[in-house]
């Protein structure tokens, strides 16, 4: 692909909104951005802290969904954890500071493997998402984790 990449670049992919139910009855909303051809792998995106504005449509993950499927053949799975709102919608439930979000991560890993039949899945955590990945991404079927430990300084 020899196309210029700009901040607003959106490349062709198959975008599918979804709802997933957790073991404790929460309805999670999200979107799968898949390549038009065969998927070479996938990333499950765990977003930053929702009480500080983190969500599935955080700029880094939105750009990944807009570009990676076409550029690399990677499927990008994004979702809002419980009680989180983005332009894509709101997941039910309430933010639980990483405790009950365990069910969100487990449900999404199951969705990736059992429903989407994805292989070569990597979990990506950004800030709060890193905490979720380290604590709750225990499904042995995923490959590894890509963790972004970002913090603010004064």
Put a short name on every predicted segment.
Residues 1-41:
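N-terminal cap/lid segment of alpha/beta-hydrolase-fold proteins
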Residues 35-78:
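Short, surface-exposed "cap/lid" segments of acyl-processing enzymes
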Residues 48, 74, 79-84, 88-89, ...:
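Active-site loop/turn elements of alpha/beta-hydrolase fold enzymes
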Residues 53-55, 82-96:
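Cap/lid segment of the alpha/beta-hydrolase catalytic domain
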Residues 94-115:
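Alpha/beta-hydrolase active-site loop
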Residues 120-125, 150:
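Short beta-strand immediately N-terminal to the catalytic nucleophile in serine-hydrolase-like folds
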Residues 125-133:
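Gly/Ala-rich beta-loop-alpha elbow adjacent to hydrolase catalytic centers
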Residues 142-154:
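A conserved short beta-strand
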């Amino acid at each position: 692909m020899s196309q210029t990449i700009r901040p607003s670049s959106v490349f062709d992919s198959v975008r599918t909104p979804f709802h997933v139910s957790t073991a404790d009855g929460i309805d999670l909303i999200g979107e799968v951005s898949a390549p038009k051809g065969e998927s070479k792998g996938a990333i499950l995106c765990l977003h930053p802290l929702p009480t500080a504005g983190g969500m599935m449509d955080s700029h880094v993950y939105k750009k990944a969904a807009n570009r990676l499927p076409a550029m690399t053949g990677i499927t990008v799975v994004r979702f809002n954890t419980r009680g989180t709102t983005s332009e894509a919608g709101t997941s039910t439930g309430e933010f639980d500071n990483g405790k009950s979000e365990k069910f969100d991560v487990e449900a999404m890993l199951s969705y990736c493997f059992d429903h989407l039949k994805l292989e070569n899945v990597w979990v990506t955590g950004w800030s709060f998402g890193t905490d979720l990945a380290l604590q709750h991404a225990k499904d042995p079927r995923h490959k590894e984790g890509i963790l972004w430990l970002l913090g603010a300084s004064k």
